[in-house]
Amino acid sequence: MATTKEYHDYIIECLNKAGQVTSKKMMGEYCLYCNGTLFGGIYDNRFLVKQTETSKKLLAECPLELPYEGSKSPMFLVSEFENTDFMKQLLERMIKEIKK
């Protein structure tokens, strides 16, 4: 099942309160970028982020899920995307790690 435009728009609206987030549509799903750095995506109406040291600490209670069939890289399923302070901290720290 592809991600709906409504879910995509809602996630982007929430995330843009925490940082400059953009998306790129790919095969019905969306890759997510913060300040030009790929950090996650929206897959089948699920907001997933890459595994980094920060995401492992801050999202330790969140399940790991595969973004699509055949993927070998599990990602964290994030449910607190409406919490602006939490998302700002998560994105800022993750982007620094990914850019290293």
Predicted regions and their residues:
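Charge-dense, helix-prone N-terminal extensions
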Residues: 1-100
